[in-house]
Amino acid sequence: MESEKAMFVIVTYDVASKRVTKVMKTCRKYLKHVQKSVFEGMITEGKLNQLKNELISLIVCAEDKICIYKVDNLKYTSKEQIGIIEKDNNIL
């Protein structure tokens, strides 16, 4: 059995305050918390589907928004950070 290839994702969200903690804790199970409503990291398609299903069960689609950016190849990407820089924040 071939192992699943991981991809880099960035997840951002804008959800009602009463759901923020649950959404944050769910994202934290799969990805690194890099800003207030932003998570990033390497994840397989299977784990990403699990994350999406968990998030869908938590939000109200008419009120909340979650964006997932997928990067299959990091070759042409770079990251520039200004301000507070954490030690282990060098994924890109």
Question: What is each model feature region?
Answer:
Residues M1-I10, A16-L92:
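Basic nucleic-acid-binding interfaces
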